[in-house]
Each structure stands twice: as C-alpha cells, then as structure tokens.
Amino acid sequence: MIRVHNTYGIKETFDAFAKAGFEGMDFNNDVFPYYTDEHDETFYRELGDYARERGVDICQAHAPFPSSYESAQESEKRFFEIVQAMENASYLGAPMIVVHPCTHVLLTEENEEELFSYNLNFYRRLIPYAEKFGIKIAIENIQRVSITSTPERLCRLFDTLDNPVFTICFDVGHCLFEGVDPAAAIRRIGNRMVNGCTHVHDNTGDKDTHTLPFYGNVEWDSVMKALADIGYAGELNYEASAFIANLPTDLYPLGLEYMAKVGRYLIGRFEYYKKQV
C-alpha cells in the first residue's frame, strides 16, 4: 500500500485495491503521518466508510514505528503518538492495531530481563486507552533485536500481560529471518493468535525483504496447514511492499491483481486444510 499511496493518494489507493480484488487493508501509521491530531474524528470515520463502500474493510492498523527511542523524552512523545494512532484507528473501524515492541535497546543476554520489564510497562500503559477506544492491541514478533524475537519470548510477554485487550500479530517473514520455522512457531503460539492477525511476506532468510509469497524460502503450504490446525480465525495481511515497489507505476494495477490472486491461492490452501481438521 505504501508505494501505491504515494502515487495515488489515500482514497485512490482504496479504489485501486478494491478493483484488484482485495477485501481488506492495513491502515499503516508506520509510514503515513496519520498518528497526529491533524485530522478529526469525522475525517477518519468518513475515510473508513469510503473504504467499506468499495468493499475494502480496514481489518487492522499499524501504530507508528519505532515504539521507543534512546531519549526518554522522545519515547514519551512517541507513546502518545501511538495512543493517537489507536484512537484514529478506532474511528476507521479497525478492530485491532499492531503495536511493535520497544527496540530502543538491542536485545542481549545481559539486558533481556530489563528490556522485558520495560516492554511490560509500555504495553500495560496502553491498556486503558485500548479499553477506552474499543480496540485490540496486536503484539508483533520483531526479529533478532527484540523481546519478541522468538515464539517463546513473544508468548512470555503475552502471557504475563494476561489482558483481553491483547492479541498477537504473527509475522511470517520475521520468523523466517529469525531462523525459526514459521509453521512450528504458529503451533507453539497456538490459540494466543487465533483471533489476531498474520503478516504475510517472504524472504530468503538473510534479509527482511518483505516480498510476495513464493519469492523466498517460506514453505507456504505448511504455514497454511499450521494456521488451519490451530483454528486460526484472523486475517492474512500482506506486508509485501517490496514486490510492488519494484514495478513501474504503470504496472501497479496488474501487480496488485497478481498479488490478490496469490493471496486467494493461500486462502484456498488454508480452507483445504481447515476441512481436514
């Protein structure tokens, strides 16, 4: 969506995705500056209505990234930008917003407990806002440098928080980049992610390239089977911006149609395995 948005504008992006055959989208505050109070409630409600009128649901949103900085002052400013993004996402009609763990300090064996406690406090501070806005917070696995880099770390944080406002965003590409088998990770996380979301993108294991499935090393059939086996009921959400970024703008419509067809193939495999459970 990022490259398309920069070319078309936000409403035209909804039009393009609807025409290509997508039924849902991620409203990504990672990149778009929609985490301020520049626009009011009416702006976001009308934007959400515009998307749904074209058959595109805002199935999730992204909070701005990173979630923290080395500067305590900058981290506090970012915290309330995340809160603003949560409020805006609720007006759009998004049921959940992905909030990344704090990565202002790289994870090491020596600082793991300190970083765990920092993130625990960070997410706990968001609970009253999630309750106020009626939106869930999806905690994402971020590879290599974060407190959610492995399924075990992610589950520990989620279980310790132990609050219904939280769910899990499982990122397939990040998992592969971490060197963990995504299907095994899905089974390890289990029912914690059943009503969460799944970020779908591929890589070759050496770079977090965020490309389209089947253009990397992820075993997608095993991933779909694992999702079916745990009773997954969430969305499959592309984070494959690198694929569309490599195309000239004139090919965006064709590229989006192809991406939608690949997505429908994955859904078909998921539905097949779901019937076998």
Predicted feature residues:
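Hydrophobic faces of well-ordered beta-strands that scaffold small-molecule active sites
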Residues: 1, 25-27, 58-63, 97-99, ...
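N-terminal pre-domain/capping segments
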Residues: 1-94, 114, 163, 195, ...
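Active-site beta-loop-alpha junctions enriched in small/polar residues
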Residues: 1-5, 28-30, 63-66, 102-104, ...
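Short, mixed-charge, low-aromatic patches
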Residues: 1-8, 39-41, 79-82, 108-116, ...
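Histidine-acidic metal/acid-base catalytic patches
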Residues: 7-21, 78, 148-170, 174-277
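Active-site acidic/histidine proton-transfer and metal-coordination neighborhood
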Residues: 8-12, 50-53, 70-168, 250
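A short acidic, helix-capping loop that chelates divalent metal ions and anchors anionic groups
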Residues: 31-35, 67-72, 105-110, 177-178, ...
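Catalytic-core regions built around general acid/base machinery
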Residues: 41-54, 122-129, 185, 222-226
